[in-house]
């Protein structure tokens, strides 16, 4: 898919104050982050839900509530809103490329209700999907389409965002059921 159409940031430095701000002028944001010189983030949390898909370079190490998660290229990690975490981006390579999807809590909750997923266990904790299921269900293409949907007129964009987030939620829920 056309990753070049996703907004790209190189060595972006995130502050705790920036992380605590909600999404501005959108309910969903997709960005492509490359870290080379800036190889770690501050400990932070967000008022929105965040998914990270490493697409090239290094494995990423996330520290969350005393636990360590190694997220390899092709895997997907989900952070519920308000979860404190920090990342180190150069574990086994000198750079890291990641697609980062940020979803406003109001949009998240509306999609969860509409898809009748109020009891989906994965939504309440850190969740990591392996590269095989990420490739099978082509999450990278879904996330690139989400980024491209920013170009739609506002009223249409919100409807498309709801459809895309609902699709993602249903797929992750089904993947969880298949692996139980």
Protein language model regions, located:
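Acidic, proline/serine/threonine- and glycine-rich low-complexity intrinsically disordered segments
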Residues: 174-176
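Amphipathic alpha-helical segments enriched in hydrophobic/aromatic residues interleaved with Lys/Arg
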Residues: 115-172
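Generic detector of well-ordered alpha-helical segments enriched in charged/polar residues
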Residues: 7, 11, 29, 109, ...
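A short, N-terminal "cap"/entry segment at the start of jelly-roll beta-barrel domains
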Residues: 1-27
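Hydrophobic alpha-helices of bacterial signal-transduction systems
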Residues: 6-7, 67, 131
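Conserved small/polar residues in nucleotide/adenosyl-binding loops
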Residues: 178-180
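N-terminal regulatory/effector-sensing and dimerization cores
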Residues: 25-121, 152, 158
